[in-house]
Amino acid sequence: MKKYLAFAVTLLGMGKVIACTTLFVGNQASADGSFIIARNEDGSANNAKHKVIHPVAFHQQGEYKAHRNNFSWPLPETAMRYTAIHDFDTNDNAMGEAGFNSAGVGMSATETIYNGRAALAADPYVTKTGITEDAIESVILPVAQSARQGAKLLGDIIEQKGAGEGFGVAFIDSKEIWYLETGSGHQWLAVRLPADSYFVSANQGRLRHYDPNDNANYMASPTLVSFAKKQGLYDPARGEFDFHQAYSQDNKNDTTYNYPRVWTLQHQFNPHLDTVVSPGETFPVFLTPITKISVAAVKNALRNHYQGTSHDPYASHNPQEPWRPISVFRTQESHILQVRPKLPQAIGNVEYIAYGMPSLSVYLPYYQGMRHYQPGDDKGPIGRATTLPTGHSARCKRWLCRTTMRLRQMCNTPAKHLNSKQLSSSIRWSRAI
């Protein structure tokens, strides 16, 4: 791919909306029998991430207090060892994003979604004291003994404290994958991923079917359907209850910002699928891939930017391209959590982490059995992507990966597109490592 220097210019001009792309793969749909959950965490290119191992904690008292609002939750007396990828400015106590605990449970939190106006008018987000992405991993992962239990605990918290925003959260263990979506301030639905299927989400509520009599595959807030009826969000005379229609947003912006990402990945794994990017299109929730999906294929999916098509904004140098790519410059990190049930947990559970834009970064494996990470994993202060780090900051993994991205841009950019300032900056960055 050519002219990588245009990546930063193009994507920084596309706004700072927090957004992500999510992909799950069931064990019968994967190439090696693995369970896989993966997500690009898109926010700010300037946000350094800390990869941290939290040790087991005993005799805890008091409450966990969120970093970015007033949410609180009682601390468990005993908290399991767990891993996390924190924002640099949270004292490694919030915005954990993804990790595994010592019970072998993993999670990815969150996929930002937007619930419908009518649903939120009836049951608004509890923005000041409700649970948000900031706190979810820190509260759930230290105590969840299974993927199902993790989803249920998050649902219980939403019912009791409320959701402070719309989100989707994935849970994984050696037996199954669960995915929970908010419906409103206190309504939620969680679904078990069919073993032979994969699932894609791109900043929009995707779940639809709910069977309250099928406890093996569905969990939900107890008033999910009755509340929708009462508030006029669902009319039984029109057919089966549809969670997406009742509780999720679907507007013009979704057609260009979200639909193309779902369409692209579904057509990557099911090329003959009869869907188009068009207002009102209904994409299948779960699909069985034509060819089983490997971790390498998941990496390629998270690196997708419509390459080879007219919608590739980087090749066309078009910051006004309406289709939002999967791989963007403001990706803070991209993670893939893989569970290989036939192997010992210490090596069977792996986190692959790419710092920065996945198209320009490298996925580094972190095995659950690792007793400690390298010193650079938990370093990285505030700073702009164009600021030269100094001292210990220059050794942090995030800066090293950003430097690699910069050098790859240089190597793939014709000299005529570079000026002396850009060249000097890149040379200084290369010397910093």
Swiss-Prot record:
The keyword Ubl conjugation does not apply. GO terms for biological process: proteolysis. It catalyses: an L-aminoacyl-L-amino acid + H2O = 2 an L-alpha-amino acid. The keyword Hydrolase applies. InterPro entries: C69_dipept_A-like (IPR047804), Peptidase_C69 (IPR005322). Keywords: Dipeptidase, Hydrolase, Protease. The active site is at 20. This is Probable dipeptidase. It comes from Salmonella dublin.
